[in-house]
Amino acid sequence: MRSLAVVVAVVATVAMAIGTAHGSVSSIISHAQFDRMLLHRNDGACQAKGFYTYDAFVAAANAFPGFGATGSTDARKRDVAAFLAQTSHETTGGWATAPDGAFAWGYCFKQERGAAADYCTPSAQWPCAPGKRYYGRGPIQLSHNYNYGPAGRAIGVDLLRNPDLVATDPTVSFKTALWFWMTAQAPKPSSHAVITGKWSPSGADRAAGRAPGFGVITNIINGGLECGHGQDSRVADRIGFYKRYCDILGVGYGDNLDCYNQRPFA
């Protein structure tokens, strides 16, 4: 979301549970698997060293009971793998020849590097607080006041007045990313609904090449910049994280992993 094209803010209901929910996310991903996925997040070179913890992730996930708990065991695993993959791309510190590979370096950053803008768009509904800046923070790199406002309302924290909480409180940080993951912003479905098979594409979606799968989630997050123009290294990076995490959780990838030939959402 660091480079996310402008998302129209809507007050959407967080999808707290879609379909049949089962248990805690800790039954899907163990502490050891979390550490294996995000192998170098606590490396000394990482800005977010010590910030993103398994306990904070589980605590945040427990506030969204549908996450990692909807549908079959495979659907639940893909939900977790896809969430951690997309957010790993947003926070990556990896490079092509990095130790253990580029896809072992997710969650290296907790806030946008070199942010110069305040990301404040005039809004009566989500007014910017004096002196506050709404640059990318947290796993999804939440940005703009019109995202901080509804995210904060959904999780019960005033993020318009306290945006720095997304980079100082790890549970709040994960909650903002999960809010984005679980919440539809029309005409876009929620990422959660897509990866768990609860989204049915419309005729317009099908005409735009948008079929259920991981690729549509990339389109939701940053389709305006990454989708619909053939091969894109950023899309490939997201897929690389996803495949690695699916392998760790022991689940297949599903279909339609890229968005190379998908038109972005309007």
UniProtKB/Swiss-Prot annotation:
Record-listed E.C. numbers: 3.2.1.14
Signal peptide: 1-23
EC class of the enzyme, as a word: hydrolase
Top-rank taxon: Eukaryota
Keyword Nuclease: no
Enzyme active site: E90 (proton donor)
Reaction it catalyzes: Random endo-hydrolysis of N-acetyl-beta-D-glucosaminide (1->4)-beta-linkages in chitin and chitodextrins
Effect on the protein upon substituting E112Q: Chitinase activity is reduced to 0.33% of wild-type. Decreased anti-fungal activity
A cellular component term, taken from the record's GO annotations: extracellular region
Annotated site, May be involved in substrate-binding, chain positions: W95, D118
Pfam families: Glyco_hydro_19
Outcome of mutating W95A: Chitinase activity is reduced to 51.2% of wild-type. Decreased anti-fungal activity
SS bonds (residue pairs): C46-C108, C120-C128, C246-C259
Alphabetical list of SUPFAM superfamilies matching this protein: Lysozyme-like (SSF53955)
GO molecular function: chitin binding; chitinase activity; endochitinase activity
Reported tissue expression: Localized to the starchy endoderm of the seed May localize to other parts of the seed including the aleurone cells (at protein level).
Variation of activity with pH: Optimum pH is about 5.0. Stable between pH 4-8.
Temperature dependence: Enzyme activity is retained almost fully under 40 degrees Celsius and completely destroyed at 70 degrees Celsius. At 60 degrees Celsius the activity was 15-30% compared to the untreated enzyme.
Annotated phenotype, changing D118A: Chitinase activity is reduced to 79% of wild-type. Decreased anti-fungal activity
Keywords (A to Z) from UniProt: Antimicrobial, Carbohydrate metabolism, Chitin degradation, Chitin-binding, Disulfide bond, Fungicide, Glycosidase, Hydrolase, Plant defense, Polysaccharide degradation, Signal
One biological process term in Gene Ontology: cell wall macromolecule catabolic process
Known function: Defense against chitin-containing fungal pathogens. Binds the hyphal tips of fungi and degrades nascent chitin.
Similarity comment: family membership: Belongs to the glycosyl hydrolase 19 family. Chitinase class II subfamily.
Protein name (database record): Basic endochitinase C
Lineage summary: Eukaryota, Viridiplantae, Streptophyta, Embryophyta, Tracheophyta
Gene designation: rscc
